[in-house]
Swiss-Prot record:
GO terms for biological process: anaphase-promoting complex-dependent catabolic process; cell division; protein branched polyubiquitination; protein K11-linked ubiquitination; protein K48-linked ubiquitination. Keywords: Cell cycle, Cell division, Mitosis, Phosphoprotein, Repeat, TPR repeat, Ubl conjugation pathway. The lineage of its organism: Eukaryota, Metazoa, Chordata, Craniata, Vertebrata. TPR repeats lie at residues 4-33, 37-62, 70-93, 128-159, 164-187, 198-222, 232-260, 267-294, 299-329, 334-362, 369-397, 402-434, 442-474, 479-508. The modification Phosphoserine is found at S490, S560. Belongs to the APC6/CDC16 family. It comes from Mus musculus. This is Cell division cycle protein 16 homolog. It holds the Pfam family TPR_12. V-shaped homodimer. The mammalian APC/C is composed at least of 14 distinct subunits ANAPC1, ANAPC2, CDC27/APC3, ANAPC4, ANAPC5, CDC16/APC6, ANAPC7, CDC23/APC8, ANAPC10, ANAPC11, CDC26/APC12, ANAPC13, ANAPC15 and ANAPC16 that assemble into a complex of at least 19 chains with a combined molecular mass of around 1.2 MDa; APC/C interacts with FZR1 and FBXO5. Interacts with PPP5C and CDC20. Interacts with CDC26. Interacts with FBXO43. Residues 577-596 are annotated as: Disordered.
């Protein structure tokens, strides 16, 4: 009986996804052919596609086909991998080649010339070997051995340069640094294995690799003209905009992709991250619910839900629950680990946040975000040395990221290196301005305030005021910005303006210790300058409508009693250590006081005026 028509019918049913029909006829063909290896292989394929993994593996291994044929060995291992029996799958792949297999292949070669034992199965040896390396990499990934997983993926790609899955696992999971990605691309034998499509492969690989490069118009080689509108190419461009902090352009591109393909797998994480950055809570809510309804077993669905609860605030427990579900579905899903760390960081749970970030750093060696957030947590726990080290690592991966540059400037400020801090802050500001010519996103407000702080330290009071006023444009109701402006006015001797700004700051935040203390000092100094005339105008300025003249004259002693000489010396030492000159003793005669146009000397520690380190907000 000629079995070829039945074999073709089995393939036809497989192509039509009628797996039960294919299984029925594959079983009959295997019996009719007296269990020819090829027919048993296709029977096992049908069993695998109907999720009968142990039956499929038994069909191959009971006949010792996994020891004779690479394709059967690969399929048997894949069955155990699908059943989550990772060690058994690895044992099959790493099985030593038996002597009888080598004799069998020699016999085939002698009998049929140079016939490949797998040629009848329409599979090349290099393709099967590449598939084995790919599967081995996935198993190592599941066993948390990232080093061997990376090596296996590289080998799979070198054996078969068309094996995009291996390339995608290396790049989308950030398993390689930028330098390692470049070395991998240069090591691929494109000339040997794909002379005709060499230009196409080089373009698609390079387009996916350059995520930290400055986004520019995609240059398509003439031989592959027509890829401009390809969604994968557009997503790669959007990713470059995302990593260069141009979130508006990134959102525009990802929205275009989502209109054409609403569930584009590569686009979804970038689109979700952009929605978080632009604070589009309603859109993220709608998208996350749609994803959970349609793809409940996909980690990106629960990642989207977790990001939504993180964004709305005060829902961190809910966020952790859904992000934990995402990491359970795929424990190598780095973005979910980063967001999981954010849910602890916003509650100042630094140890738990860092544990999540360290997990993300192990999974995403080529991504700068885990390093950035680890450094941020170390900075918040006053460990500036370790913070500087991790920021340095983040900067080596993403040298153009203004968030990282800003945090390096914060560390320099905390170390008292004012000039260095100013350089880093200005560099970050230039990078931001290059994105959209002007600073408009409110997340850059801490950078402007920090520029104001460092300019104040360098006695550039006019510039400092300008930066703080720019910060007020972005976030108008920030008490710390008003107190910073008031502080600069007090340093310049403009006590009337200083009092106004400190009052405004206290109106926004009544428990602001710094503003309360400084308001007392400024009122004291202002009255000292105005003793010649205390009238309704002065009382109005000081918001002291119920005070009589005697109270106004003695307000200094009520607010801050005179210090004795010994106390003054101690305070002077503290302020000098903080980089500030002390306030002159208020009992001195007015003529002995320095010119108010010079530095205003304040008798208090400036530690209450905290530098803002929150520009790197907890985004994806």
């Amino acid at each position: 009986m000629n079995l070829e028509p039945l074999r073709k019918r089995v393939r036809q049913y497989l192509d039509q996804q009628q797996y039960q029909s294919a299984l029925f006829w594959a079983d009959k063909v295997a019996s009719l052919s007296h269990e020819e290896p090829q027919d048993v292989y296709w029977l096992a394929q049908c069993l695998y596609l109907t999720a009968q993994y142990h039956r499929a593996a038994h069909a191959l291994r009971s006949r010792k086909l996994d020891k004779l044929y690479e394709a059967c060995r690969y399929l048997a291992a894949r069955c155990h991998y699908a059943a989550k029996e990772h060690q058994q799958a690895l044992d099959i792949l790493d099985m030593e080649e038996p002597i009888n297999r080598r004799l069998f292949e020699k016999y085939l070669k002698d009998d049929n010339g140079s016939r490949d034992p797998s040629s009848d199965w329409e599979m090349s040896q290099s393709s099967i070997k590449s598939s084995i390396c790919l599967l081995r990499g996935k198993i190592y990934d599941a066993l948390d051995n990232r080093t061997l997983a990376t090596y296996s993926y590289k080998e799979a790609l070198k054996l078969d340069v068309y094996c995009f899955e291996a390339f995608d696992l290396l790049t989308s999971h950030h398993m390689l640094t930028a330098q390692e990605e470049k070395e991998l691309l240069d090591s691929l034998p494109l000339n040997k294995l794909c002379a005709e499509e060499q230009e196409l492969l080089r373009f698609v690989f390079e387009n996916k690799l350059k995520k930290y490069n400055k986004p520019s118009e995609t240059v398509i080689p003439e031989s592959v003209d027509g890829l401009q509108e390809n969604l994968d190419v557009v997503v790669s461009l959007a990713e470059r905009h995302y990593y260069n902090c141009d979130f508006k352009m990134c959102y525009k591109l990802t929205s275009t992709v989502m209109e054409k393909d609403p569930f584009h797998a590569n686009c979804l994480p970038v689109h979700i991250g952009t929605l978080v950055e632009l604070n589009k809570a309603n859109e993220l809510f709608y998208l996350s619910h749609k994803l959970v309804d349609l793809y409940p077993s996909n980690p990106v669905s629960w990642f989207a839900v977790g990001c939504y609860y993180l964004m709305v605030g005060h829902k961190n427990e809910h966020a952790r629950r859904y992000l934990s579900k995402a990491t359970t579905l795929e424990k190598t899903y780095g973005p979910a680990w980063i967001a999981y760390g954010h849910s602890f960081a916003v509650e100042s749970e630094h140890d738990q946040a860092m544990a999540a970030y360290f997990t993300a750093a192990q999974l995403m060696k080529g991504c700068h975000l885990p390093m950035l957030y680890i450094g941020l947590e170390y900075g918040l726990t006053n460990n500036s040395k370790l913070a500087e080290r991790f920021f340095g690592q983040a900067l080596s991966i993403a040298p153009e990221d203004p968030f990282v540059i800003h945090e390096v400037g914060v560390v320099a400020f905390q170390n008292g290196e004012w000039k260095t801090a100013e350089k880093w802050f200005l560099d970050a500001l230039e990078k931001i301005k290059a994105i959209g010519n002007e600073v408009t996103v409110d997340k850059w407000e801490p950078l402007l305030n920090n520029l104001g702080h460092v300019c104040r330290k360098l006695k550039k009071y006019a510039e400092a005021l300008d930066y703080h006023r720019q910060a007020l444009v972005l976030i108008p109701q920030n008490a710390s910005t008003y107190s910073a402006i008031g502080y600069i006015h007090s340093l310049m001797g403009n006590f009337e303006n200083a009092v106004d700004y400190f009052h405004t700051a206290l109106g926004l935040r009544r428990d602001d210790t710094f503003s309360v203390t400084m308001l007392g000092h400024c009122i004291e100094m202002y009255i000292g300058d105005s003793e010649a005339y205390i009238g309704a105008d002065i009382k109005d300025k000081l918001k002291c409508y119920d005070f009589d003249v005697h109270t106004m004259k003695t307000l200094k002693n009520i607010i801050s009693p005179p210090w004795d000489f010994r106390d003054f010396e101690v305070e002077k030492q503290n302020t000098e250590e903080a980089g500030l000159a002390p306030l002159q003793n208020s009992t001195k005669a007015p003529e002995s006081r320095p010119n108010l146009e010079e530095t205003f000397e304040i008798e208090m520690n400036e530690s209450d005026m905290m530098l803002e380190t929150s520009m790197s907000d907890h985004s994806t």
